């Protein structure tokens, strides 16, 4: 399992019409990308990357569980074979508490039309 406490959050709707969700610490980062029109692109729908392009891919997320305290991400091992067993992620949300509601709203919009997002209180 990859575990880290994120101290930085960035959400963005880019000029290229992408939704980007990014969490990072001094040693790790997680980036999720999706087209803002929520339609799959040439390589897939939702792009996942953690700690480098070696551990990136499209449509590899099986489930993302979020709460105000943390995100837990499970990847589909069959779709993420190149991830070398890095299929489970736990990211503590050590970001400003005032930013957490907006981050959760962004994730709801980001995962609209999928069954990947599970919210916990």
Go through each PLM region and give its residues.
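Charge-rich, low-complexity N-terminal segments
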Residues: 1-29
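A short, structured beta-strand/loop element
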Residues: 65-81
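Acidic, aromatic-enriched beta-alpha/helix-loop junctions
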Residues: 29-68
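Extended Gly/Ser/Thr-rich low-complexity repeat segments
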Residues: 29-40, 82-96
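Residues that cap or initiate secondary-structure elements
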Residues: 10, 27, 38, 52-54, ...
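Short polybasic amphipathic segments
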Residues: 19-21, 45-47, 71-73
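Mixed-charge, glycine-accented linear interaction segment located at domain edges/termini
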Residues: 86-121
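Generic detection of short hydrophobic beta-strand segments and adjacent strand-loop junctions
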Residues: 4, 48, 89-93
């Amino acid at each position: 399992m990859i575990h880290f406490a994120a101290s930085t959050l960035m959400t963005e709707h880019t000029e290229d019409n992408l939704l980007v969700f990014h969490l990072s610490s001094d040693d790790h980062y997680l980036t999720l990308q999706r087209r803002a029109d929520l339609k799959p692109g040439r390589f897939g729908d939702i792009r996942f990357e953690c700690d480098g392009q070696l551990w990136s891919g499209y449509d590899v997320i099986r489930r993302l569980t979020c709460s105000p305290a943390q995100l837990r991400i499970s990847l589909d091992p069959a779709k993420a074979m190149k991830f070398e067993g890095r299929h489970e992620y736990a990211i503590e949300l050590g970001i400003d508490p005032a930013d957490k509601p907006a981050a959760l709203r962004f994730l709801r919009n980001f995962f609209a039309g999928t069954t990947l997002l599970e919210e916990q209180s």
